[in-house]
Every structure is written in C-alpha cells, then in structure tokens.
Curated annotation (Swiss-Prot):
Protein name: UPF0229 protein VNG_0746C
Family (UniProt): Belongs to the UPF0229 family.
Lineage of the organism: Archaea, Methanobacteriati, Methanobacteriota, Stenosarchaea group, Halobacteria
Signal peptide: none
InterPro entries to which the protein is assigned, alphabetical: UPF0229, vWFA_dom_sf
Protein species of origin: Halobacterium salinarum (strain ATCC 700922 / JCM 11081 / NRC-1)
Region of interest (Disordered), residue spans: 55-91
Length: 442
C-alpha cells in the first residue's frame, strides 16, 4: 500500500470517527456519560482469521451417513430461527474520552476554532528584562540604548567643518553670509561656530583639502573646488569622537510582568417545563444542551453550570432533574431570565466567560418576549445568548418567541437562534450556536 492509499485510508478512518460522534450525539444514549467522561459507542471491526473453505469440505465414507453428536453449546435464544428476527444487539464497544478530547473532536467535526480567553488573573510572574522605564536603579541602565541615542544625535548634528570654513574664504563673505548659505544647504551649524572659526581659521583639515590663502571669487567656485566629505567617511576615518549623552535618553530595564489568567466559564441552561413541553421536545433539548456542556467543560479551565426550569415562574434545579421535570403551568420566559440575571451577579463578566442557553417550543405569554425577555437579554452581559426552539415535525408550530428574538437581534455576533425539529437537526443547531460567538470575546 502506497503513501496515497495510506493517506486516503487515514482520512476514511477520521471521517468515520466523526460520523460516529455525530450519530452518538443525535441518536445515542447520552445518559451513560458523566461530566468528566464521555462514552461514545464505536463499531467493532472483525479481525482477520483463517476459515475453512465452504466449497472444499471433502467427501464421506461408504454406507449410510449418521448424524454426528452436537459439539459445543446449543444456540442461544435471541439469534432467531430460520427467517425470524433475533433480539440481540450488534457488537460494539465504548470509547471513553474526556471533555477536552470531546471538544477537540467536535471542533474538527464542525470546523470550529473557538479560542477561549482567560479573564481572572490568578498569578503574576516576572519574565525577561525586556521592558524599560525612565527611572530605575543605576545597575539596570540600558547603556546600549543611551549610546545609540547619543550617536544618532551626533550624526544628526555633524557637518563637514572644513567645507564650511572654506566658505569663509569666498571674496566678500562674512559670518552672516556663510550662515545664510549654510542654512540654505541644510548644514546643521550655528552662527556662533562660524564666528569662532572666522576669528581663528584653520588652514586645512586632516584630509588636506583646504590650502592656505585660498580665496574664491564666488561661492560657486568654492563648491566646485572643495568636495563635501560624508559623515560616514569621517567617522570611519577618525571615529565618532565625543558622543553627547543626555539624561533624557536614559532607560532602565525591568522584568516584564506576565499575568496568568484562568479561563473560567459559567453556563446558564434554561428550559421551558410547561405543559406543552412533552417528552419528544424534552429529548431534543437534552441532545442539544448536553454536548454543549461537554464542549464548554473541555474548552475552559473551570466550568460551572446553572440549571433553571420555568413555566410561569422560574426556579433552580439540579442537572439530574433538568431534562425530565415537567409542570402543568403556563409559560413566561422572562421569569427565567430574571433569575439568571440574579444568579450571574455572583459571576462578574470581568472575571467569567458567561453563556446563557434557553430552550422551549417558542410559546410565551402575551408580549412577554418584546417587553421583558429582549430587554433582559440586552442587559445580561454574556459571550453568547442562544435560544433553541424545539418543534417536532409531528406537532403544530404555534410559538413565536424564536422569530421575535431573531428579528430583534438580527446578525448580532453574540445571539444565536436555531430550530430543532428532529435529531438530525441537532448537529446543525450546535454548529449554529458555537459558530455565532465572536471569537474576540471568547
């Protein structure tokens, strides 16, 4: 088998594993998994084995054939007789993964790239001495920076002294004329320096370019006779000389403070438990919310979950009761958001990543969505708000809550609205929810 075949086989195995994960989420037994271990059923593959050729059994001896004695145990019940169907389940095993691996597998399956951000600072450590300040102990002085700044200033202020001195030998030129000419030539020389040189001229420089008693009739003649020596050439020939160091250029090194932030998350799961939420709807909620819990547990360092049930009132429940509880009252979704807002006061948004997931069949009391729920969703700071409408295909869709929320928030990057009508919709709903979150706030 070549490299190409190996690669294709690898992709086939990976794709089959992702399909197994999707089938488990949509149709598998979620109750067999716990908060710290997800048990995904996998199909067993028969290992290669030698078998007798069914067409080469050999012959029999002479005479009548008598039936032989049965060897081994008789067939177990459940395998079926003749054309009857058996009642044994297919061979399978479970692959147990932790939430981190589950999150990675789901990311790969859905093509997600959620990178949660830490918020709460739990520790500070000193890193390398890469930061600088204007003040500090003399022992931490960054002399290289100080010298470099001085050298830059030296180069910026440098000029060819012999060239300027030569301008003083132009016929009829004095200090003012030379200074005006130097300014026009962008030569960084002061009038005081020119005046001092005029009082005590230097007949030549190290290069011997200016000769004694040389006088030019015009500045053009001087410029034609004397070449300007570049600063780089002078420094290479005689060194930089005295470099001016100034206190304003002093910088002192200190270690960079590295903040270690803990990635904390609190997830508020809200479910309508009113009389209209029959078992088929509750199952769709469980198949959507449970993988989200596993996913966020795997993504964050510390995950806490709050479960709120509501009809016309709202109350906190344990996770074990959350998906099975049912009441006979009406529906007022805002009561759940009011309770969620109070609960989240204990989880400051500056320190916690916050998710608020709600689910129901879309039914709500008159005007409660517009007057109460939508304002509350605006007031509750969260990485992501999501509403999952569960409407099995065998029922009449009468709820309007999801549509009103969708209209109110539009394409807002922290509000997701999705509808689940059957298990096949669950993976799409999860993808819609997780891909809606703006990764900058995660």
């Amino acid at each position: 088998m070549g490299l190409k075949e190996d690669r294709e086989r690898f992709h086939e195995i990976g794709e089959q594993r992702r399909q197994d994960l999707a089938e488990f989420i949509q149709y598998g037994d979620l109750g067999g998994s716990g908060p710290d271990a997800v048990r995904v059923p996998i199909k067993l593959v028969d290992l290669p084995a030698f078998e007798y050729d069914q067409l080469d059994r050999g012959g029999v001896g002479q005479g009548d054939v008598d039936p032989g004695d049965q060897v081994g145990e008789p067939d177990e019940a459940g395998e079926g007789d003749d054309d009857e169907a058996g009642d044994e389940s297919a061979d399978h095993e479970y692959y147990e993964m932790d939430p981190e691996e589950f999150a990675a597998e789901l990311d790969e399956r859905l093509g997600l790239d959620l990178d949660p951000k830490g918020k709460k600072v739990v520790a500070e450590t000193e890193g390398a001495f890469n930061e600088t300040a204007r003040r500090g102990p003399r022992g931490t002085l960054d002399f290289a920076h100080l010298y470099k700044q001085g050298l830059k200033r030296k180069i910026a202020m440098d000029f060819d002294e012999a060239y300027v001195t030569a301008a003083l030998r132009v016929d009829g030129w004095g200090v003012d004329a030379v200074y005006t000419w130097a300014r026009e030539q962008h030569i960084p020389v002061s009038r005081a320096w020119i005046a001092e040189r005029a009082r005590s001229p230097s007949p030549d420089d190290d290069a011997g370019r200016v000769v004694d008693d040389a006088v030019w009739a015009s500045i053009d003649a001087m410029e034609a006779a004397v070449d300007v020596e570049p600063t780089r050439t002078r420094i290479r020939r005689g060194g930089p000389g005295r470099v001016p160091l100034r206190r304003e250029d002093e910088r002192f090194r200190h270690p960079k403070v590295v903040e270690h932030r803990e990635r904390n998350v609190v997830v508020v799961n809200i479910r309508d438990v009113s009389g209209s939420m029959r078992e088929s709807k509750r199952e769709l909620v469980e198949r959507t919310f449970t993988p989200l819990d596993w996913y966020l547990t795997g993504k964050y360092d510390n995950a806490e979950f709050v479960y709120i049930a509501h009809d016309a009132d709202a109350w906190e429940v344990d996770r074990t009761d959350f998906f099975g509880i049912q009441s006979g009252g009406g529906t007022r979704i805002s009561t759940a958001y009011e309770l969620a807002e109070n609960v989240l006061d204990e989880y400051p948004f500056s320190e916690w990543n916050r998710y608020v997931f709600a689910a129901g069949d879309g039914e709500n009391s008159h005007d409660d969505t517009e007057e109460n729920v939508i304002p509350l969703m605006n007031d509750i700071d969260a990485n992501l708000h999501a509403y999952v409408e569960t409407q099995p295909t065998d029922g009449v869709q009468t709820g309007t809550h999801a549509g009103k929320v969708r209209d109110a928030f539009g394409d807002t990057d922290n509000v997701a609205v999705t509808t689940v009508t059957e298990p096949d919709d669950v993976m799409g709903a999860i993808e819609t929810i997780l891909s809606t979150e703006d990764n900058d706030t995660a």
